Amino acid sequence: MMRNLAQQVGLFVCRISSGTSAWNSVISASYFSAGITRYSRSTVYRGYKAWQNLLDSEKRRWQRACAKYQGLVTSLEKRLCDMHQSYSTGDEKGMIIYEDYIYFQDNGCICRYKPNTGEDSLEVLLISEDLGLGDYEIQKIRVSPKQKFMAVTLKGYEREESTCVVVKLDNGPQVTHCIENVFSCEWATDRMLLHTSQVNVQCRQVFATDFSDANGAAQLVYTENDPRFFVDLYCTRDKRFITINSNSKSTSEVRLIDNRCPFEPPVLVQKRIAGVIYYIEHSNGCLYMLRRHGEAAEYKILKAAVSSGMKHWEPVYEVQERTKLVDMEMLKDHCLLFLKNHNQLSLEVIGLPSGAVLQSIKLPAWACALELDHQAEYGAGTVGFSLSSPVHPPVHFEYSLRKKQLSVDTNHSSDGIHQFHTLRLEAKSKDGTSVPLTLLYKDSEKQMRQRPLLIHVYGAYGMDLNMSFKVEKRMLVEEGWLLAYCHVRGGGELGCNWHSEGVLDKKLNGLEDLGSCISHLHGLGYSQPHYSAVEAASAGGVLAGALCNSAPRLFRAVVLEAPFLDVLNTMMNVSLPLTIEEQEEWGNPLSDEKYHRYIKSYCPYQNITPQNYPCVRITAYENDQRVPIQGLLGYITRLRKAARDYCHESGTSESRIPHIYLDVHPGGSHCDSLSWEESLRKVATQLAFLHMELKLDIPRRCKGSTQ
């Protein structure tokens, strides 16, 4: 099954990752290594001491500035905490059903029990605090076929790489091994674990550790030599094969390890062909390939016998043009496809091996995000999933293959579904392309033009905007805010071609789309520039930062999280571990003057100029390997100088100089270096900044605590 990908800004909630499809396993790896992976490099060349002094200066500046927000931050933080508790969905999403046991995570502990015997069978298998690893979150859990061993990956807030802890389960749980720098792992047999090695945010090697060997020594299984490729592992839904997936932005290659004979060398499915991306599943003796070939092509499902070349693959199903394949669940005799067309989610059930469409179901119009349940049984007759939106908490649904019926779980809250409006709009971009956008709001006595508007954008790597439920978004809409999600080119909301139209020398399409979406909303009477703000994270910072340069009067404030703001210098520095990999998204300015000129034309850092900028707040992480702090220090310094220069040149009062802040947190991960409590305060601070800079009234539920 696939997992939706983005936790870019909202509150962090730790959940176990229990199993993914080949489709999502590889997409997640690509996204992890590049989709939200951004490097920045300042052109302000300084020695270590100089930039450390600049960093210390920025920290002091922010400490002085944040004093004026403190009362509002405290009250917002309390309200967010209360709302989070009231909308908590419990631990059921972290549960893994494995034969007669249910595994679950609770406050850093992993436990299991037999549902038929109740609490008497409860076992505590692992307590993360007892490992002495510091503040770690549980990332993934993998149980061996006969439940002799359990592998758990844990990730600390201070580093990108995870630690894999192996627990022996029979005769009482016991930690036997810790394997450092692991990105993904899968059990081939009850005692053989395959795992990838992550070094400098790259995965290039696969190892196998045999725990029947007293030494538990790791043996090298596969090495990827092309720096454009990222390696990930996935176990097919029927547990027959482990796939070794090597993927660049545009090309794939998959090898199979047969779990019945795991010591045999991996078997190549199809040699890599430039422009061909594919993923592999297995069912009833057939391999199923999810494949796309070419920039404009959408995904197709094909089938063949094991070890057949590309010419022997037979078509089974094809995704329609301008349709996004959101998720996929492969079962024994069926495949469930979750699709998005015109921003509307739907479910299609196809029979295997024929590929005939057995049923098509439109999902509720309010739904913006989908998450499949963890690892349904391969031969199960039902598939569960949750639907949500930024303002609607998850609602659980089940599809019955036997009844051919979709049902909603009445035990899950549907609170607020009818309180809020979900409006699907389209804006005409500069070249006439229709760009979809989603507007969320609640009825209010206040006129639409006087209400604050928060605009969201990403527009890179073919990834959708994250539109899952977040309590801070719910709170804003309850207070009368409008939330706009601009599905610009470069993202994936309209399928693979939508990404192709916003990549390489078409990146400016995404910028034009964003400006057109905001202007369209204002033209329809939804808010106005004085009450509008933009929010973006990571690669979304490219478009948000570029729009600050090209159309700063469209909005009053911008909040950025670990943003990518210096595309040109990043892509010219091949010593950075991901620069070569990123060339398929941004181009190579070192070898092609065309790309050098083109990137320079939109790069946020390169195009800062004296003008009246919006207020800016950037959240950064001191040891972030993906967006090094030096680059953001250079950006902030140049932006602040440009704002001051404009003030002096235009004779504007210094009181009108926009507030430009860099809030630096300790930690070494990208966008998620904080504990839950720290994330709560970060979000509250971002909201307080927006309220103050847009000159809004204090939220009515916060007035008492700020006086």
From Swiss-Prot:
Keywords recorded for this protein, A-Z: Cytoplasm, Hydrolase, Protease, Serine protease
EC number: 3.4.21.-
Lineage top rank: taxon: Eukaryota
Active site residues per record: 538 (charge relay system), 624 (charge relay system), 670 (charge relay system)
Any Pfam family: Peptidase_S9_N
GO cellular component terms given for this protein: cytoskeleton; cytosol; Golgi apparatus
GO biological process, one term: proteolysis
Disulfide bridge partners, by residue number: none
PANTHER family (alphabetical): PROLYL ENDOPEPTIDASE-LIKE, PROTEASE FAMILY S9A OLIGOPEPTIDASE
Self-association and partners: Homodimer.
Function: Serine peptidase whose precise substrate specificity remains unclear. Does not cleave peptides after a arginine or lysine residue. Regulates trans-Golgi network morphology and sorting by regulating the membrane binding of the AP-1 complex. May play a role in the regulation of synaptic vesicle exocytosis.
Protein name (record): Prolyl endopeptidase-like
Organism per entry: Xenopus laevis
